[in-house]
Regions:
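Short hydrophobic segments within beta-strands
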Residues: 43-44, 272-274, 354
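Short, flexible loop segments at the rims of nucleotide/cofactor-binding pockets, characterized by
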Residues: 17-20, 98-104, 326-332
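Redox- and metal-dependent alpha/beta enzyme cores, enriched for Fe-S-associated oxidoreductases
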Residues: 53-83, 272-340
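An N-terminal, globular interaction/scaffold subdomain
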Residues: 42-117, 137-138
Length: 415
């Protein structure tokens, strides 16, 4: 297991189309920010994007910027800047990296797209379905830009999603409309709102089909592919362009399946990733698992942008239902049932949990879940200690040693 093996990673042609989509997205925001029109709304990644788009806003998602800070390995040097301002090193490193970057006047958008700064918001809209940190994050920028901040406060630890849950969230979403209309300078057109929700649903369905191709043996896609291909599902839901680019991706993946072509050469082990990616180690982790003929092919994280409950004929209630059924909002019992279904569907041999130091809401290995799931399914697991953005919290050598030992364990189980 310790012998190094050269790995040839198979790139998807349509990844280039998605890269162009993301470049166009950021350039459009930059131009609007400079001109002052169209107006720009900031939104959390699972926030009320459909309402914002229907009101004519361009929508910027700061979490994607933070992921870029992590992937470019800029974040580790920027987090201490926010820590010095009073933000604890234990809170979300998306927040601390992003605020640190703003204070220092740097952004990965400069090298990637020639863009000098993040876009100026006219309004910021959050949903705390991910965590409370997003509210603090947006409030900080609201003060800096003198822009209004509004949001939805979601229930936590939800078991069965009830009509009471849905009604409560739908009312909060409806209450956003009036203040957002004032900023937009226009009324919410319900026909346009329904059109946007329909496109968001179509994008979501295509993204699900993309991720579901990993159930094929061998899988035509990896989790690490998914973390970069998910861009349009996050920033582009509600747009035709996101739908179009995912149709191209899905066709390419289906062609791989038809040809028996796997993303990992000679795939032997199928791994489920539970938790956040380590953005600054995507390539290293992809190479590590592939060198062991292991494909990390499915995850809870990438599935977080599948919203099958969206219904253009009932936009507010269906948005409330979709965004409350989100995995991160649910109880441990609901999460465990979900993961068990995923393990069966993707024919998984082992689970890797990422215990992200600054993201407790996405670290589901702290209260006995790995042990309970292994007892129920017989599928072994490994926990990796690290973080989504702060590489000081990760030991590369320890991760490598533990992963190699885990794959050896899976090998021994096969006899």
């Amino acid at each position: 297991m310790t012998e190094e093996k050269k790995v040839v990673r198979k790139k998807l042609k349509s990844a280039g189309d998605i890269g162009k989509y993301m470049a166009d997205y950021y350039v459009e925001l930059d131009e609007a920010s400079k001109k002052g029109e169209p107006k720009i709304a900031w939104c959390t990644s699972v926030g009320p994007a459909e309402i914002l788009r229907a009101l004519g806003f361009l929508v910027y998602f700061p979490e994607t910027h933070s992921a870029m800070l992590g992937a470019t390995r800029m974040a580790t040097d920027l987090i201490p800047v926010a820590n010095a301002m009073g933000y604890s090193p234990d809170i979300c490193s998306y927040l601390t990296a992003d605020i640190g970057a703003f204070v220092k006047g740097v952004t990965p958008l400069s090298k990637a797209f020639g863009i000098q700064s993040i876009p100026k918001p006219d309004v910021l809209a959050f949903n705390t379905n991910q965590c409370r940190d997003v509210q603090d994050w947006f409030n900080w920028y609201g003060e800096k830009f003198n822009a209004p901040v509004c949001g939805v406060h979601t229930y936590r630890g939800v078991g069965d999603v009830t009509e009471a849950h849905i009604t409560g969230i739908a009312k909060q979403m409806q209450a956003l409309v009036e203040p957002l209309e004032k900023v937009a300078g226009r009324r919410l057109d319900m026909t346009e709102f329904k059109r946007v929700v329909a496109l968001s649903r179509e994008c979501s369905e295509l993204w699900k089909k993309v991720l579901d191709t990993a159930s094929a043996m061998p899988s035509p896609i990896t989790f690490f592919d998914g973390t970069t291909l998910m861009g349009p599902a996050v920033v582009g839901r509600g747009t035709q362009e996101a739908v179009d680019v995912y149709k191209l991706l899905l066709a390419e993946l289906r062609e791989r399946i038809a040809n028996g072509e796997g993303a990992v050469e000679s795939e032997r082990f199928r791994i489920y990733w539970e938790g956040m990616p380590v953005w600054g180690r995507l390539s290293a982790h992809s190479q590590l698992f592939a060198s062991l003929q292991a494909n990390v092919l499915a995850s809870t994280y990438c599935n977080s942008w599948i919203f099958s409950d969206l219904d253009p004929e009932d936009p507010f209630n269906s948005m409330a239902r979709a965004y409350t059924k989100l995995f991160i909002v649910r109880s441990d019992a609901a999460k465990e049932k979900y993961i068990k279904d995923m393990l069966a569907f993707f024919k998984v041999d082992g689970i890797v949990y990422h215990d992200a130091k600054t993201c407790p809401n996405n670290s589901n290995c702290r209260y006995g879940m790995p042990q309970r799931l292994e007892n129920e399914t017989g599928i072994p697991s490994l926990t990796i200690n690290g973080d989504l953005n702060d590489l000081r919290l990760l030991s590369d050598e320890q991760t490598k040693t533990n992963v190699e030992a885990f794959i050896e364990q899976l090998e021994e189980r096969r006899g």
